[in-house]
From Swiss-Prot:
Residue window of motif Switch 1: 28-41
Cysteine methyl ester PTM positions: C207
Gene Ontology molecular function: G protein activity; GTP binding
Gene: RAB7A
Biological source species: Canis lupus familiaris (Dog)
Name under which the protein is recorded: Ras-related protein Rab-7a
Broad enzyme group: hydrolase
Amino acid sequence: MTSRKKVLLKVIILGDSGVGKTSLMNQYVNKKFSNQYKATIGADFLTKEVMVDDRLVTMQIWDTAGQERFQSLGVAFYRGADCCVLVFDVTAPNTFKTLDSWRDEFLIQASPRDPENFPFVVLGNKIDLENRQVATKRAQAWCYSKNNIPYFETSAKEAINVEQAFQTIARNALKQETEVELYNEFPEPIKLDKNDRAKTSAESCSC
């Protein structure tokens, strides 16, 4: 049996302050929910080992402050991400409207090799609340328009769809990590035209 090197998947969670990013992360990693969370200052992360298609991987899940005054986390925070999770509150339409800005912010800062196909996952959180303002079809339509991003409706408080959502996040992140590894091991070959080949042969001739 061949031993595989340990895989670390970096997952970034973005969204406005108060949408439940920290709650989702804690529900998934620690199976806990609390109403006493303080606003995340800067960035924080939790790790969890999970099985993805018979492969053990470590997910490093990064939580960010949603307030604009903390939005200067910089390139180092985003770089190396394997998946980006965009979270909004289904009871707060403004948090849905800012998904475009968060997605653009990530693509600018992270500069992924293939931005068109970089894996995003969208979570519409707080479905346990009654005063819903963002319809499922509206959220699905936005995701479809952005290269068909996977969409889950979640409740961090009631643990609804949290496990399923993060399974998809882990699987998509692993796929991204594998593609990056393949690209790094087998970069695009340098093509020589006939003149270059002839010149190279002539220079290497010692006669």
